[in-house]
Amino acid sequence: MGDAPSPEEKLHLITRNLQEVLGEEKLKEILKERELKVYWGTATTGKPHVAYFVPMSKIADFLKAGCEVTILFADLHAYLDNMKAPWELLELRTSYYENVIKAMLESIGVPLEKLKFTKGTDYQLSKEYTLDVYRLSSLVTQHDAKKAGAEVVKQVEHPLLSGLLYPGLQALDEEYLKVDAQFGGIDQRKIFTFAEKYLPTLGYSKRVHLMNPMVPGLTGSKMSSSEEESKIDLLDRKEDVKKKLKKAFCEPGNVENNGVLSFVKHVLFPLKSEFVILRDEKWGGNKTYTIYQELEKDFAAEVVHPGDLKNSVEVALNKLLDPIREKFNTPALKKLASAAYPDPSKQKPTAKGPAKSSEPEEIIPSRLDIRVGKILSVEKHPDADSLYVEKIDVGEAEPRTVVSGLVQFVPKEELQDRLVVVLCNLKPQKMRGVDSQGMLLCASVEGVSRQVEPLDPPAGSAPGERVFVQGYEKGQPDEELKPKKKVFEKLQADFKISDDCVAQWKQTNFMTKLGFVSCKSLKGGNIS
C-alpha cells in the first residue's frame, strides 16, 4: 500500500461508524476521479457538549481520506430556528463556537490548517443567494418545508415562517459551498432528502449525504444541549463530570439505554480505537479492549462493573477535555463565554424594584413559582361535579387550597397523598365560590376522549422544592403574576411533553434538583 489511500480505503474512512449514506454510488464515482468536497454545519445555538466529538472524529476521518472539508457556523440558521440565538448574540455565539470547535479538533490531533471555516452570513445575505431563496420558496410546499424540519427545527403549535425557510437554506448551502457531500446527524435525514428533491428543480445537482448516529445521553435518551443531566458540557469541571457520571443510568448487565456504555461506543472508541477499564487488582486489574463488542459482552455478563466503567470513562473524558478547559481559562475567552451565553436570571434591581424600560418585558420561565406539592386531602367541590378541592402542602406554614377539574380523569384515591407539581404565583381565583390558590399542572391529550395526567416530580422529592426549567434555575419568580400581562399564558404556549414523557418548555426540561418532571404516558401532550 502506498502513502496515498486507494479509493476503496478512502470510502472506508469516509463511511465508517456512519449510520446511513445516501448516494453511495455517486460517492464511489467521485473518489475514483478526485478528492471529495464535504461540509459539516452547526447552528450556533446552545453550548456544544461532548457528543460533538462524534462529528469531530468523522472530520478527522475525512481529512485522512484526503477530503476538502468545510465547517459552516450556521449563524443565520440559529436565528431562524425560533430565535434560539437572538440577533444581538449571533456574532458572539459564532465566535464562541469557532473557538470551542477548534479547541476540540486540536484536542484530538486534527490539523486546523487543512480545514476551511466559514459563517452562514458570509454568503447567505448576498443578492444571488437571496434570489435562490425566493426561487425555492416558490416551489416548496408548506407541508414539505415543515416535514423537512420536523427533527431539527423547534416544533410549535403556530410555527413561524422563519422555521419553514430553514430547510431550504440548508439545501442551498450545498450549492453555495460548492461541495459534493453534506455530513450531519441522522436527525438531519429529512432535510437531506428535501435537498435531494428540490435542488435539481433549481438546476443544481443532488449531493451525497453522510449521517452519523445520535449519541444517547447519560440518562439513556438522546444527548441534548437542553438536558443538563443528560450531557456533559465541554467546559464542565472535573468534579461536575464525576457528579454527572455518578448519577448516570448504568444498571449492571443492562446494555440497553445505557448512556455510559453508549458514550464509549459512539465517542471514545472512534477517537482512540481502544478503551481501558481501570480497576483494582483484586477485581482483575486493568483490561484493554480494542473491539467495542467485547466490552459490551463483558458488561452484559457482569464481568465489568458499572462503577469501574464510569471511573474509566471519567479518566478518558477528562483527557479530552483538559486542553479545551485550558484554552478557555484565559480572560478573553472567559469573557466571550459569559457574553455569548449571558445568565438570563441576572437583573439589576433598584430600591423601588426593577427599573422600567422601553424594552419588551422578558418572558422567561424563572418568573413562574412552580413547586413540588403533596396532596393532603381531596374532596369533591360542593357546587361543581367536575371539580376537586385539594389541600396541598407546598412547603409553607399552611397547605394551599387548589381547585382542579380532574374528577372525570383521575380517581380521588389516586390523588390522595400524591406528589404533584403546582404553579404557586397565579393570582388567587374564585372557582364556584372556593378560592383556588394555585394550579395543579397536568399533561393532556385531546381527541375523541380527552386524557389528563398530573405531572410527577422526581421520586424522593419533598413539598416546597422548586421546579425549574434547566438554565433558568437562578431567576427569581414574580411575587404574583399579573393577569393582564399573560406571562403564564405566553410561556405555556411552548409547554409540551416529550417523546420520553418529560415536561418541557421549548424542548428544555422541567426539573428539580433530583431530576426531570414527567407524566405517566401522554407523549406529545400539552401542559396546563
Curated annotation (Swiss-Prot):
Tyrosine--tRNA ligase that catalyzes the attachment of tyrosine to tRNA(Tyr) in a two-step reaction: tyrosine is first activated by ATP to form Tyr-AMP and then transferred to the acceptor end of tRNA(Tyr). Also acts as a positive regulator of poly-ADP-ribosylation in the nucleus, independently of its tyrosine--tRNA ligase activity. Activity is switched upon resveratrol-binding: resveratrol strongly inhibits the tyrosine--tRNA ligase activity and promotes relocalization to the nucleus, where YARS1 specifically stimulates the poly-ADP-ribosyltransferase activity of PARP1. It is an enzyme of class 6 (ligase). This is Tyrosine--tRNA ligase, cytoplasmic. The gene is Yars1. It is found in: Cytoplasm; Nucleus. L-tyrosine binds at residues 39, 166, 170, 173, 188. GO terms for molecular function: ATP binding; small molecule binding; tRNA binding; tyrosine-tRNA ligase activity. A motif (Nuclear localization signal) lies at residues 242-247. It comes from Rattus norvegicus. GO terms for biological process: response to starvation; tyrosyl-tRNA aminoacylation. The modification N6-acetyllysine is found at residues 197, 206, 474, 482, 490. The keyword ATP-binding applies. GO terms for cellular component: cytoplasm; cytosol; nucleus.
